[in-house]
Amino acid sequence: MRRWLLPEHIEDVLPAEARAMERLRRAILDLFEAHGYELVAPPLLEYVESLLSGTGRDLDLATFKLVDQLSGRMMGVRADHTPQVARIDAHLLNRQGVARLCYCGSVLHTVPAGMTKMREPIQIGAELYGHEGLEADVEVVRLMIAALKRAGIARVHIDLGNPAIYRAMAQGEPSAPERAEELFHAVQQKDASAAGALAVLTTLNGGAEVIERARRELPKLPRIAEALGQLERLARRCAAPGVEVSFDLAELGGFNYESGLTFAAFTPGSPDAIARGGRYDEVGASFGRARPATGFTMDLRQLAALAPAPPVRRAILAPALEEAALEEAVARLREAGEVVVVDLPGHEGARAELDCDRRLEKKEGKWRVT
């Protein structure tokens, strides 16, 4: 076996991609900060009791597990930031009003989450806690769109759903308790033959006409009427140039802990969603404090692959000399934001690899960029 081979769907990030990802990370986190979102950094490892609290079986299956050599307890490598950020909000911050939090870090999945996905995404996202009104959902969807635009994604298609509709219908299905997981995945995968009485949901996807069809074809239940109204209002308030909005009533969320409105963003050239989010009001309950919550997450690696290529790095090659004036000139250039690379002796034949388009040379007694 070749020792340099990596596991399937695990890849190194090389300099050009890493530079693009870092530019995006800084730009998006700056955008979040400008909207009042505070950065948090949960640990990569936690005991599974807290890491998986309040989540569904899908997240459990996606989580790598190992035994802690210090305590003997089972630990998990996070597969999603949301439960961790919910724990921070509920147990550590303990704020009474609205909390706006954001994050960026690696997660690890036992299997890829999509056709083009890696098993080690770098998640970046934002979450809003403490407000149950539609205003919170509007804010995070608009922020998600703004983040995608900041990443250079010109065309965005938003798919809206609401699992509350599925749950209201499932309660009236006699076999639902015994077939809960089977029904959930049948609807999510649009398998009408396995969805039984819920099969109608698999056909309700498309433009604004879907809401009117749903009002005609779905049971006349107050919860369903309210959920459809929320979808309609959210779509209206998130309309923007370059953004298309559609509805998918079979969209039930990512890891099966969404409790209300869900949304996913797509763009031409990517078969998988480039951002996902939704309501998850009950995740904090296992930490003793259920709070209204909504948010979204994106994969920096995926965004970097779709975003326009960043400008080619421009650098200045400086000689490796012990001279105070040279060192001062290099320091001034770096302070001004220039990249200055020292030309170490013995590597003259490999200078092209340094990607320097200018030189720092001494002319008429002064160090100048040429």
Indicate where each model-derived feature is located.
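Short, basic, helix/turn surface patches
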Residues: K65-V77, H185, G278, K363-T370
